[in-house]
Amino acid sequence: MRVSRVRAAQNRERILDVATKLFREHGIDGIGVADLMKSAGLTHGGFYGHFKSKEDLVAQACGRAVTLMRDNWIRTMDHSSAPLETFAKEYLAAKHRDNAGRGCPMAALGSEIARQGAATRHTVTEELKPFIIYLSKIVQGRSARLRRERAIALYASLVGAIVIARVVDDLEFSKETLNAVANAMQNKGMKRNASASRTHAPSAKKRIVSRASRETKV
């Protein structure tokens, strides 16, 4: 029996949801199409009715992962009186370190995405840019250039800390890494830019509210 358009769209969304999680858990090359489709509860043969290739899926799944991450964090910071402190604290939490499948895709897949094709890298870049713009509106700085620089430094420091904390096989060293970055940021007086208003912070380009609300925030 021919699958309806609605069911086909649901299946496609299911594949993307599963891919965003499994790629982060196992790596892009660590999960094949057959296993991915099995995890989605679908047949291998149906894959190419939704995507041109695995590379096509990778580009869309990685872009979606960044979108979900970005929207979750923006929502969290929008509802916090100390958004940067909240962001750093939750990002550097042990539960984020230990839950790559639901965590930041840049920390989980950054080095792999760098080796992907132009489509994947471009999609990730375009989905990440609004998050840097958002952060640049709430960090301190006398100029837009300085605030953007600090926003990039903040995010890059957090990503790097999680990467190292996951790589090392010494739990105390892992904890020390997370604590060191948290303390360094605290010592820099990480505070919200007093002149910035949440009304000035750009909203994410693509809100996937229903799906993002189901994504476990880490």
Residues covered by each model-derived region:
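Amphipathic, non-transmembrane alpha-helical scaffold segments
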Residues: A8, L16, C62, V66, ...
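N-terminal intrinsically disordered/low-complexity leader segments
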Residues: M1-Q10, K191-V218
